[in-house]
Amino acid sequence: MKREDVLMEALPYIQQFHGQIFVIKLGGHAMVDQLVLEAAIRDVVLLSYIGISVVLVHGGGPEITDKMKAMGKEPKFVGGLRITDQETLEIAQMVLVGKINDGIVSLIAKCGARGVGISGNDGSLLIAKRKELQVVTIEDRTERVDLGHVGEIVEVDPAILQMLLSNEYIPVVAPIAIDRESNSLNINADTAAAKIAVALHAAKLINLTDVDGVMDAERTHVYRRLKVDETNEMINSGVISEGMIPKVEGMVYALDRGVGSAHIINGNTEHNLLLELFTRDGVGTMIHP
């Protein structure tokens, strides 16, 4: 395709998306390669330049695990769920807020835009409660496990995000929330992104991760478009499994509450974000009502 054809294909999408809000979740695994992350941030800055308001929500699971090991603390998982004691929470805050969040804001500045790093604590953006005991299966037996300082979001106050967006900043949100007693809690970034998208009445919820999208049972084909009902059936049948389940469930939650569409994109490939948004066929999976 000629360069001018690429630009002309993008034009109607640019016109359609101008003035809309996109919430983009940067997956922890998709951020391991610094060059790939820089490319993703350049794409995000481009979106802001053409009139799209972007809120970034980032994860950081792999970096938290690496930091814990470097500090001599072995991460604890039960049934695939991280146990977060007080020391682990402090390490998570150090990594999420002090390292990853600051790094993304610096990259935004490097690309000529203005980013502001916040966590769910700031402006009471994300209010959470401590998760109840979780039922997990261990060696064919079920146990009830206390995950520690892990929360589930019960309320979102988007005022701080609206203020930043109205002043043309790109908010960068770390997945730490606060409870009613002002205690910090670690939260799932996919869930945070979904709930923020709903609170902002976002047009799109986008997940940049390390897979190409929702795949079939044989893992040979990527579904380009799916309806919510289809994703529910695929979860029940096991086609959507493991780490993809919370991503898709978060998107279904958002779509059921007014978000226009949701996208799962491989963030490890440069400019996939732009190709998904501004070409007819896209490169990932779009989920819609």
UniProtKB/Swiss-Prot annotation:
Gene3D superfamilies: Acetylglutamate kinase-like. Its EC number is 2.7.2.8. Substrate binds at residues 60-61, 82, 186. Keywords: Amino-acid biosynthesis, Arginine biosynthesis, ATP-binding, Cytoplasm, Kinase, Nucleotide-binding, Transferase. The record marks 25, 247 as: Transition state stabilizer. GO terms for cellular component: cytoplasm. Pathway: Amino-acid biosynthesis; L-arginine biosynthesis; N(2)-acetyl-L-ornithine from L-glutamate: step 2/4. HAMAP family: ArgB. This is Acetylglutamate kinase. It comes from Methanosphaerula palustris (strain ATCC BAA-1556 / DSM 19958 / E1-9c).
